[in-house]
Structures are given as C-alpha cells and as structure tokens.
Amino acid sequence: MKFKAIAKASLALGMLATGVITSNVQSVQAKAEVKQQSESELKHYYNKPILERKNVTGFKYTDEGKHYLEVTVGQQHSRITLLGSDKDKFKDGENSNIDVFILREGDSRQATNYSIGGVTKSNSVQYIDYINTPILEIKKDNEDVLKDFYYISKEDISLKELDYRLRERAIKQHGLYSNGLKQGQITITMNDGTTHTIDLSQKLEKERMGESIDGTKINKILVEMK
C-alpha cells in the first residue's frame, strides 16, 4: 500500500498548498466545458511537455469508487486516473511490464504528476525498428493533401498518445489552432476497415484517454483541418 499512501499524502499537500478541492461534475457539464475551449487553450494543452516511461511497474487501487494507477520512477511520482476501458484492463495491485504516457492535467506545480489514461502494455518482444508505418495524410482546407509515413513503435498504443502526437505535429508543422484553424478531425483506419475518430475542436474525451488500439494493425491516419 506504499503507492496509495504516497498518493494520499501528495494529494493532501496539494490541497493545502492551493486551497482548492476538485469536485466531480456530471459528464454533460464536462462535455460542455470541453467544447467551449478556445484555440489558445487547445494549443497550450497540446504543447505541454509529456513524460513517457516504458517497461515500468505500477500499482492499481480503488479509492472512493475511483480507479488509479501509481507509477514511481526515480524521483518522479505519477498518479494516473483510469476512467475508461483501462480500469478493467489492469488488475488491482502490482502491474508489471506497462508503458505510461503522461500529460499533466492542469497547470499546478505539484510534485506529483496527475494524468488521465495513457497506460498500455509493453511490447511483447524487443523491436530493432518501428513495428508499423501506416500512411499519414494531412488535409488542410482546400490545399493539396500531404502524404507521409507515420512511425508506430508500440504493439499496444493509447488514443491519448496518438491524439497528442498528431495534434502536436499539426500545430508545429501545419498551423493548427492558429488563425481560426480549429475545426476538423483525425480518422484512424484499421486493417479491417474500422475507424477511430477524434474531434479537433475539443480535447480528447477523458473516458477515451484510456482506450488503446493494436499499433500493428493501423492502416491509415487522416488529419483534416479547416
């Protein structure tokens, strides 16, 4: 229970330091707040630094009906909230051979990293190179479609990671969230024809941050901006 003790202590200190207690809000209210995010808010969120750890061990527990996974590497302690299918993907207690993709929620300077989802199983074998290179198409307004390869290095990859990396790239290389360029979507097409879509006008839904897909079976990725 060491991880849980650390988590509670960190959370208590954070509340004392900021004087803020975060309460639950209903999903309808949360979605409304997300949809109201401005270009600058989205640009800020998808430009935040990320913390990535591979082949680590985490501790999963439930506290007051909520599911968490704790990971400590060196002096970096992270508490990850599991809100979607990931809460059933990992067992209570110790989970080894996992990868975590951490993007801090909020802008506090607390020592603990508070993140949502982004936990996946580590690769079953070690790869020398990338495991998959699906076609990446970038479509911006009425401009010609740009095509490239997108390099996948994980067998099990979270929508959170794909969403972040694709938007970060679009921000830096194609002007997403600048000069009114906020609408559009990301479409990830699998080998069997099924698709996963992400709305660029809002942050990825919290419940989907824990979803993961088979990186070896991604056939094509389309990023449409307008």
UniProtKB/Swiss-Prot annotation:
Cellular compartments per GO CC: extracellular region
Name of the protein in its database record: Staphylococcal superantigen-like 1
Localization: Secreted
Subunit structure: Homodimer.
Protein task: Mediates virulence by proteolytically cleaving host proteins, including collagens types I and IV as well as human cytokines IL8, IL17A, and IFN-gamma.
GO annotation terms (biological process): proteolysis
InterPro entries tied to this protein: Enterotoxin (IPR008992), SSL_OB (IPR015282), Staph_exotoxin (IPR008375), SuperAg_toxin_C (IPR016091), Superantigen_bac (IPR013307), Toxin_b-grasp_Staph/Strep (IPR006123)
Molecular function terms from GO: peptidase activity
Predominant location category: secreted
Annotated gene: ssl1
